[in-house]
Amino acid sequence: MTSPPMLDIRNLNVALLNGRPILRDVSLTVAPGEVRALVGESGAGKSMIGKAVLGILPRGLKVTSGEILLEGQPLHDLRLAARRRRVAEIAALIPQDPLTALNPVRRIGAQIVDPLVKIHGWTRTAAQARALDLLHRVHIRAPERVMQSYPHELSGGMRQRVLIASAFAASPRLIVADEPTTALDVTVQKQILRLIRELQQETGTAVLFVTHDMGVVAKISQQVSVLFQGKVMEDAPTEAVFDAPDHAYTQALIAATPSYADPARPFSPVPQSLIAEMSAALAMEVRR
């Protein structure tokens, strides 16, 4: 018998309280052990998909229709407390900005250990050992010292490594990585991407990876969903998307990405005429 997808999103619609659509009939799956990228420009709705899965949509947004299933179980069938427990058991988040994600007045060790103890029922001794092990595995030198440090005492790359360690600490089966390299310089970004990929392959964790960078998509994912104004424009294996992109918007995103392998290759921004045409088509859908 075939096992269900780790994550299965079916015709998900999210809107503002005034009815303005944010996500439009989004459907996608993430298989166990798979990395799926969500890519698009700012405002495409990429992060909102991850937040809807985790049940942390911002105030003023609501799911109006559709289903989200984790390991085949519909989350909408569960009461709020049971849903939170289910999500916490299966999924974890790597946020975009480590400086705001980490509590500035608590030591790093406590921020990794306490969730393991309070949410997942670990003993404090086991949780501390797990935290030290993960800090070591994300290539942090002197993890014992870092456990006693505060966030402001670490560099941006070190803080992001801490968040990765924290996300993997409870052995989640799904990780939502919400633009985890956006705030980092290119050199550190490359290290963090390699680190996430290493841990993902080692643990077999499924990853929903949010990014605006097609270069990152090529490096880390097997599947990709291209979004524009909350709608999936193209959904295909990553290799196929780069070899023969089907949608004009996907073609434009690739053309707008600098090539480090071929610096002489020209690139250009996404044409405003294409954006206007796609926006008008989506507006017509809303009117219908």
Predicted regions and their residues:
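Short catalytic/signature loops enriched in Gly
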Residues: 5, 141-144, 237-288
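ABC ATPase NBD coupling module
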Residues: 62, 75-92, 110, 118, ...
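Conserved ABC ATPase "signature" region
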Residues: 74, 126-145, 255
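A short, proline-enriched helix->beta-strand linker immediately N-terminal to the Walker B motif
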Residues: 169-173
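A short, surface-exposed alpha-helical micro-motif characterized by mixed small hydrophobic
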Residues: 217-219
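ABC ATPase "signature
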Residues: 232-236
